[in-house]
């Protein structure tokens, strides 16, 4: 038992040493900067999806209330209400262009940190650029699917009851799924986050890193990001003096700190995987 605890402690110290030595907190700060630039174009696209399907904005914000800090939701809600009256194709195109530019830049920052951790030779610039653009489009698809999952509710299951063949409707437990959906959709959102993290980890890791190791580190990172977001939301909700310290900038500071935490956890998952693979080789 003592030997196992020593091994865990040594593993943790090795991860901490690698994390600080590689300057991952600096990379997380750069990543959070690009995430801020990505957020508002993403909200433009979300606004377009809401208007396209005539969905309820308040339902989206209420569904995310348990996952995101209140300050982050405040910024998102204010911005979405601001752009809600505009469904301009030019505005959407500008948002998509900015999204691809900022998201691909953030991904390249993440890949550079992963190259340093794994001691990879940096690939051709155009190849890395193309990969980051493709992953940015995948990120946009994930956002779209997340919006669909959030807005899927009782109306959707009622629609299935009306249009599915009777035999199929009897086989599928629609009533049970309808009651459990308020929790199942959070599980689906976690799966979307996990899938995106796994794809990024796999794309940035060298080929000698096994899929099993990528899966375990991705699970750790995705779970940590979700858990940290919930805890951070609870902590901010309990802190009544936060707005007194930062005034009108409180929501923006909460957003920046939350994105910085998420960036650190994403890179921490890479550091854990690197130490794991290095120990496996010994």
Predicted regions located by residue number:
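Membrane-embedded alpha-helices and immediately adjacent juxtamembrane helical segments
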Residues: 1-282
